[in-house]
Curated annotation (Swiss-Prot):
Job of this protein: GTPase that plays an essential role in the late steps of ribosome biogenesis.
Gene from which the chain derives: der
NCBIfam families: GTPase_EngA, small_GTP
Every EngA-type G domain range: 4-167, 175-350
Subunit structure: Associates with the 50S ribosomal subunit.
Protein's UniProt keywords contain Iron: no
Lineage, top ranks: Bacteria, Bacillati, Bacillota, Bacilli, Lactobacillales
Name under which the protein is recorded: GTPase Der
HAMAP family documented for this protein: GTPase_Der (MF_00195)
């Protein structure tokens, strides 16, 4: 059963992201004292008094004429539709504003339980001003200080009381994957095309998607959690504090992923920054699928795809294990193949090989290509065993670990790939001296 869901809603700059972070106990939203900085909704999971629930942080609702603010409003309304309870946040410093009243009108139409909280009540003297917020029509307003965490317990008590009575949490065994790549390679458009719902703000402005958004969906009889990350920016261009934090958070999203979709813009080709972006996922040992997006915009002949694939293999030699797929978020070309590919790579990440079978392959490999000699001393490999998954990790017991040159280690990895299906996942080999 789906967890009960709380959506935090309010006009810009009332402290929604601060409260969201307080509830989750970790910094998930990007907090900056600028209206509109929380550009998209974010999902998280929390617990209060033994009850688990999901939390949605939204961009500020603003009914101004700016197209970007209209998109934020749309995202907030989607979050409202998905929520069981709405936490309507205002702030004591501004008092009841016209924007608060317009937000209230949206919430009246939602016909969902609403808990009204007034943020920035950082000292007792300010509590007397809270009664002005009764005029919003949602009953007793709860005083709250996001900065100090004061009053949050009372707010969460009210939220839990308003949740539906069912309390059946579900263990998350979904396949988690993220989309990484330079800004403006089309990650958000890919997310929308895969989901068929505008869950992520799509804009031609580079760097629009600042946070990682967790979204569950089902396909090919599997449950997936998709984490859409902010584009990783060139170091010289990352000058805003918010963008710097978004890069950090994108890397954390990679750490949370089982599989990473590394997205390249077919129009722009391969850039130096692409290599650094892919390196993050490779070094983290994640499963990787290379997704060439905007393929519909490229003029093609019979050799175009093969030539582009060869270029990728040349520029990303360390990703020789990663499958490549050419797609178009706009036309949805080949997107139907992605879920099955993700499942296959996830299975390969967790594949375990029996030691007896493993050592048969090892002995055959040594017979074909004998171990090298270094300074007159030959490497002797006695046996191999698998010690971990995600990524598959093998220990080879040898007479001297220093004799295992990286070229022979690479040979052994290639032999494992030929014998077993490890497509999409790196393989680690550790040499240990036999005692």
């Amino acid at each position: 059963m789906v967890l009960p869901t709380l959506a935090i809603v309010g006009r810009p700059n009332v402290g929604k992201s601060t409260i969201f972070n307080r509830i989750l106990g970790e910094r998930v939203s990007i907090v900056e004292d600028t209206p509109g900085v929380t550009r998209d909704r974010i999902y998280g999971k929390s617990e209060w008094l033994g009850k688990e629930f999901a939390v949605i942080d939204t961009g500020g609702i603003d009914l101004g004429d700016e197209p970007f603010l209209a998109q934020i409003k749309d995202q907030a309304e989607i979050a409202i539709d998905e929520a069981d309870v709405i936490l309507f946040l205002a702030d004591i410093e501004s008092g009841v504003t016209d924007a608060d009243e317009r937000v209230a009108q949206i919430l009246y139409r939602a016909k969902k339980p609403v808990v009204l909280a007034v943020n920035k009540v950082d000292n007792p003297e300010r509590r007397q001003d809270i009664y002005d917020f009764y005029s919003l029509g949602f009953g007793e307003p709860y005083p709250l200080s996001g900065t100090h965490g004061i009053g949050l317990g009372d707010v969460l008590d009210a939220v839990l009381a308003a949740f539906p009575s069912e309390d059946k949490s579900v263990e998350d065994d979904s396949i988690k994957f993220s989309l990484i790549g330079r800004p403006n390679v089309g990650k958000s458009s890919l997310v929308n095309a895969i989901l068929g719902e505008n869950r992520v703000i799509v804009s031609p402005i580079e760097g629009t998607t600042r946070d990682a958004i967790d979204t569950k969906f089902e396909a090919v009889d599997e449950t997936f959690t998709m984490i859409d990350t902010a584009g990783i920016r060139k170091r010289g261009k990352v000058y805003e504090n918010t963008e710097k934090y978004a890069v950090m958070r994108a890397l954390r999203a990679i750490d949370r992923s089982d599989v990473v979709l590394f997205v390249i813009n077919a129009e722009e080709g391969i850039r130096e920054q692409d290599k650094k972006v892919a390196g993050y996922a490779h070094e983290a040992g994640r499963g990787i699928i290379i997704v060439v997006n905007k393929w519909d915009t490229v003029e093609k002949d019979n050799h175009t795809m093969k030539d582009f694939e060869n270029l990728i293999r040349q520029e990303f030699q360390y990703l020789d294990y990663a499958p490549i797929i050419f797609v178009s978020a706009k036309t949805k070309q080949r997107l139907q193949s992605l879920p099955a590919m993700i499942v296959a790579v996830s299975e390969n990440q967790t594949r375990r090989i029996q030691s007896s079978v493993l050592n048969d392959v090892l002995m055959d490999a040594i017979t074909v290509t004998p171990t090298p000699t270094v300074n007159g001393k030959r490497l002797r490999i006695y046996y191999m065993t698998q010690v971990a998954v995600k990524p598959p990790t093998f220990v080879v017991f040898v007479n001297d670990p220093d004799l295992l040159h990286f070229s022979y280690e690479r040979f052994l990895i290639n032999q494992l790939r030929q014998a077993f299906d490890f497509s999409g996942t790196p393989i680690h080999i550790i040499a240990r001296k036999r005692k």
